[in-house]
Regions:
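N-terminal subdomain of lithium-sensitive/metallo-dependent phosphomonoesterases centered on the IMPase/IPPase/PAP
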Residues: 1-90, 271-274
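A structural micro-motif at secondary-structure boundaries
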Residues: 139-145
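Small-residue (primarily alanine) positions within well-ordered alpha-helices
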Residues: 13, 17-20, 137, 220, ...
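DPxDG-like acidic metal-binding loop motif
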Residues: 79-138
């Protein structure tokens, strides 16, 4: 994409993410109302997320009616050779339900299976993380980069654990133990996209995830690469299709990867291009 094309796409992405974030904030009262209405709060949150995704699709469609749009709440098969927007209008649904701030809007533009731009918007804190391929990463318009000076013993790591009933859970818990012993503190992630944005901004030093999907990963991949962080798949598939990935400051890679250990290739990879 040319610089002019990227600039236009970035403006559209910003408008779409802000529209979704504003809807999430305005709709929080509907969760509280479930105490009276007896409606399922998770179902209400799902409806709110679908509405936010529809807003994003509408904003994008006005400028790019020819582009594919693939969202968590409305997945479609993305096609090689076509531009596709990957969206998660509510990444961190559990925290949204509880009124916590650890949720975000995630949006990325992928062209020929390569993420070109990514934005992660934290509406609770009004923090907008954005990155354009080859042009760096920003937080609310100011350049950001990953942390490079943290001693390994003081590293702040984050793990996106799978569901409690996942066959991967035992493996991931073992990884948490090794990383906590061999590096520094480890916290459990709720919003994967927001965690990757925080790594890009130097707030944490490493992140890894099992059962990841490209809705969350695409925006984070651009942010991480453009901030100077390393991001890699662990399951021998292209990064955008990976279900298990890790990211960190370059100086931590060797130690971090050794502590994580190998991961088996899973037949249940994220939806592939075709």
């Amino acid at each position: 994409m040319t610089d002019a094309e990227l600039d236009l796409a970035a403006h559209v992405a910003e408008c779409a993410a802000y529209a979704a974030g504003a809807h999430l904030l305005a709709s929080r009262a509907r969760i509280a109302e479930t105490m009276v209405t007896r409606h399922d709060p998770e179902q209400v949150a799902g409806t709110i997320a679908a509405e936010a995704a529809a807003l994003m699709r509408s904003v994008i469609g006005r400028t790019y009616p020819q582009h594919d749009f693939c969202a968590v709440d409305a997945p479609t098969r993305w096609r090689t050779g076509r531009a596709c927007w990957f969206a998660d209008a509510l990444d961190g649904r559990a925290d949204y339900l509880r009124g916590s701030g650890a949720y975000a809007v995630s949006l990325a533009l992928v062209v020929d299976a390569e993420p070109q731009l990514g934005v992660v918007y934290d509406p609770q804190r009004n923090e907008f993380f954005g990155a354009l391929r080859g042009r760096g990463a920003v937080l609310n318009g100011k350049p950001i980069c990953c942390e490079t000076q943290t001693p390994p013993r003081l590293a702040r790591m984050a793990a996106a654990l799978p569901r409690s009933d996942s066959p991967r859970m035992a493996r991931c818990i073992a990884e948490v133990g090794r990383v906590a012993t061999g590096l520094g503190t480890v916290r459990r992630s709720v919003s994967r996209a927001l965690e990757m944005a925080h790594l890009a901004a130097g707030r944490i030093d490493g992140f890894w995830a099992h059962e990841l999907d490209h809705f969350n990963a695409a925006a984070g991949i651009v942010l991480l690469r453009e901030s100077g962080a390393l991001v890699e798949a662990r399951d021998a598939v292209p990064l955008l299709d990976s279900r298990s990935m890790f990211a960190c400051a370059p100086a931590l890679r060797k130690r971090f990867l050794a502590l994580l250990g190998p991961v088996a290739v899973s037949p249940g990879t994220a939806a592939a291009s075709g």
